[in-house]
UniProtKB/Swiss-Prot annotation:
Official protein name in the record: Heat-inducible transcription repressor HrcA
Protein's gene: hrcA
Keyword flag Transcription regulation: yes
The species this protein was found in: Leptothrix cholodnii (strain ATCC 51168 / LMG 8142 / SP-6)
Alphabetized SUPFAM superfamilies for the sequence: GAF domain-like, Winged helix' DNA-binding domain
Function recorded in the entry: Negative regulator of class I heat shock genes (grpE-dnaK-dnaJ and groELS operons). Prevents heat-shock induction of these operons.
GO MF annotation list: DNA binding
Top-level lineage group: Bacteria
InterPro entries noted in UniProt: GAF-like_dom_sf (IPR029016), HrcA (IPR002571), HrcA_C (IPR021153), WH-like_DNA-bd_sf (IPR036388), WH_DNA-bd_sf (IPR036390), WHTH_HrcA_DNA-bd (IPR005104)
Length: 341
């Protein structure tokens, strides 16, 4: 357990290092901590903090820098809240405040997180079943039919079907009316199962067309399963902490390209109550010691449907990132709830 003096020195050291990116020495702490302590006394306290694994000494400097464990103690017990909502509101958040297509809201959110943090913004796409609200067939020409799929939230997808039979427009209207009367509101898979039972009762050509529509709908859903939107990866190239460490840079870009590990981490964060912070490799999922993740779930009508966050160096302004993530999660939830309403 640290005494108040040690806590204050650790807090000051972390804040100075976050601000400057340079190892912090005892003289700097003596001037900025507000404690009337000699540099010698401060050196003794720093030695104790180092033994506890809270700070470390780079080989090239007499100063100290925080470790992941030191950052964790700082985040858990030393942050203070400051007003930040107006900066978010005044920095391009307007698109998020408007009900819009979910894809556009999610893309805007990732860009907003990246813009405000100057790091990487990530947002998982809302989880939803592959339900359709309306389906329509239009004749394009001989043996070519346009299938229009409309989801409950207004997303529209078009697919061209190449058919073995040349359907008239009246046949297509008949199939459209039947599908919408009997299957609207079901998932694509639900429609498939119902058709298996009912296809014999339908005229052969119409049944075949409906089966083709279900197959096209399945393909459309599978193509539209991008689960994670990432924005601002290149921002990390300008972070001095990574310097010319090509190994770390390569790992980072593999992480953003493959997305699997990030999705596992963010899915775990969806069960958190508010903002959650992973420092360095402590998540066990993102295997990069130099990266931290600040994340929070977002809700639609009281139900958690996704997670968003900021990914940056362990030397980040955690207080600021927490508020960026917290406020953005609320903006996204509001925009999506209004859209569904």
């Amino acid at each position: 357990m640290l005494d108040e003096r040690a806590k204050m020195l650790l807090k000051t050291l972390v804040e100075r290092y976050i601000a400057d990116g340079q190892p912090v020495g005892s003289r700097t702490l003596s001037k900025t901590s507000g404690l009337e302590l000699s540099p010698a006394t401060i050196r003794n306290v720093m030695s104790d903090l180092e033994e506890l694994g809270l700070i470390a000494s780079p080989h090239t400097s007499a100063g100290r820098i925080p470790t992941a464990r030191g950052y964790r103690l700082f985040v858990d017990s030393m942050l203070t809240s400051r007003a930040f909502a107006r900066e978010v509101a005044d920095t391009g958040s307007a698109p998020l405040l408007q009900p819009d297509q979910p894809k556009r809201v999610i893309a805007n959110a990732a860009q907003l997180l990246s813009s405000l943090s100057q790091f990487v913004g990530v947002v998982t796409v809302p989880k939803k079943p592959s339900v359709f609200r309306h389906m329509e067939f239009l004749r394009l020409g001989e043996r070519r039919v346009l299938l229009i799929l409309v989801s409950p939230d207004g997303d529209v997808q078009n697919r061209v079907l190449f058919t073995a039979h040349d359907y008239t427009q009246s046949q297509l209207v008949e199939a459209t009316n039947y599908l919408n009367a009997h299957y609207a509101g079901l998932s694509i898979e639900g429609v498939r199962e119902r058709l298996k039972l009912e296809v014999d009762a339908l005229r052969g050509e119409i049944g075949t067309l409906m089966q083709a529509a279900v197959q096209a709908g399945t393909e459309a859903v599978n193509e539209d399963t991008e689960q994670l939107i990432v924005s601002g990866e290149r921002n990390l190239l300008g972070v001095q902490d990574f310097g010319s460490d090509m190994g770390s840079i390569r790992k980072m870009f593999d992480l953003f390209e493959q997305k699997t590990q990030l999705l596992r981490l963010l899915d775990g964060s969806s069960r958190a109550d508010g903002v959650r912070i992973y420092i360095g490799g402590e998540s066990g999922v993102v295997p990069i010691e130099e990266l931290s993740v600040v994340s929070a779930p977002y809700e639609v009508d009281g139900q958690v449907v996704g997670t968003l966050g900021v990914i940056g160096p362990t030397r980040m302004a955690y207080e600021r990132m927490i508020q960026i993530v917290d406020i953005t999660s609320r903006l996204v939830g509001n925009a999506l709830s209004q859209k569904q309403g």
